[in-house]
Amino acid sequence: MSQKELWYETLHANFGQYFSVENVLYREKTEHQDLVIFENPELGRVMALDGVVQTTERDEFIYHEMMTHVPLLAHGQAKKVLIIGGGDGAMLREVSRHKNIEQITMVEIDAGVVEFCRQYLPNHSAGAYDDPRFKLVIDDGVNFVNQTTEKFDVIISDCTDPIGPGESLFTSVFYEGCARSLNEGGIFVAQNGVCFLQQDEAVNSHNKLSHYFSDVSFYQAAIPTYYGGIMTFAWATQNPALRQLDLATLQNRFAQAGLACRYYNPAIHVGSFALPQYLLDALTTIPKVIGLDSSE
């Protein structure tokens, strides 16, 4: 191990994780972020932005299947999907597996990320960038949702942590724009961190989203790369019934969609909305947490 280069993640100040580096495939500071892609013997190709791992070939399927199939199958009739972020292409890959969807718009702030990932993480997108339903917009996500006149059935915020370029995707002005950009019966979901270590993120998101959506909650999955426990995904709609679909309904929709997944299944879908008590307590007993710009 001592003879190998080690790459250390810097998300948390007092502890973290390291990766052995077999080969650095790409390293560059783009217009918005410091990007590196390297190979690890256990996880395959790994992409990190600003010192924080974003995705690995080994376990990305868990994150992307849960971020897409949960809202899309809960909706049941989605035709237009908006992805905020998602430059590695895996979110697009999973959304494009739903043949009933007519339009997929992806808004990515950094064109460099898209270019690098198409070259160095081709398995993530798996050709999805060539889908005729796909449209790429290079823009800030906050600006897009507050300027567009389009309406979407599902909005997926594949945001980084609330630092650097990703910080604006945790603000009220972004959530308000997303609520306005959804069709009736639409669903908004977003990456919301590992709640055991980043509980404030979930509490702040819940507080802000509740101003614009009548049903706000979280669902979860365990993703090895994102250490510290379960990862939470924000869920926001105007229709509580979409979060409470029975197993039989989801099984029927899953079968009709013809999906073959490695992590997602209808039972996982139902169970993912069961949250640990410490998070439920935080959401009900902490009225407001300072730290993520709750005023904007």
Curated annotation (Swiss-Prot):
Catalytic activity: S-adenosyl 3-(methylsulfanyl)propylamine + putrescine = S-methyl-5'-thioadenosine + spermidine + H(+)
Compartments reported by the entry: Cytoplasm
InterPro entries from the UniProt entry: PABS, PABS_CS, SAM-dependent_MTases_sf, Spermi_synthase, Spermidine_synt_N, Spermidine_synt_N_sf
Enzyme class: transferase
Keyword terms of this UniProt record: Cytoplasm, Polyamine biosynthesis, Spermidine biosynthesis, Transferase
Chief place where the protein resides: cytoplasm
Origin superkingdom: Bacteria
Binding locations of spermidine: 64, 88, 158-161
A cellular-component GO term for this protein: cytosol
Binding of S-methyl-5'-thioadenosine, residues: 33, 108, 140-141, 165
EC numbers: 2.5.1.16
GO BP terms, alphabetized: spermidine biosynthetic process
Pathway per the UniProt entry: Amine and polyamine biosynthesis; spermidine biosynthesis; spermidine from putrescine: step 1/1
Gene3D superfamilies per UniProt: Spermidine synthase, tetramerisation domain, Vaccinia Virus protein VP39
Positions of the catalytic residues: 158 (proton acceptor)
GO terms assigned for molecular function: spermidine synthase activity
Domain PABS: start-end pairs: 5-238
Classification via HAMAP family: Spermidine_synth
Known partners and oligomeric status: Homodimer or homotetramer.
Role description: Catalyzes the irreversible transfer of a propylamine group from the amino donor S-adenosylmethioninamine (decarboxy-AdoMet) to putrescine (1,4-diaminobutane) to yield spermidine.
Family per similarity comment: Belongs to the spermidine/spermine synthase family.
NCBIfam families in the record: MFS_SpdSyn, PRK00811.1, speE
PANTHER family to which the protein is assigned, alphabetical: SPERMIDINE SYNTHASE, SPERMIDINE/SPERMINE SYNTHASE
Protein name: Polyamine aminopropyltransferase
Gene: speE
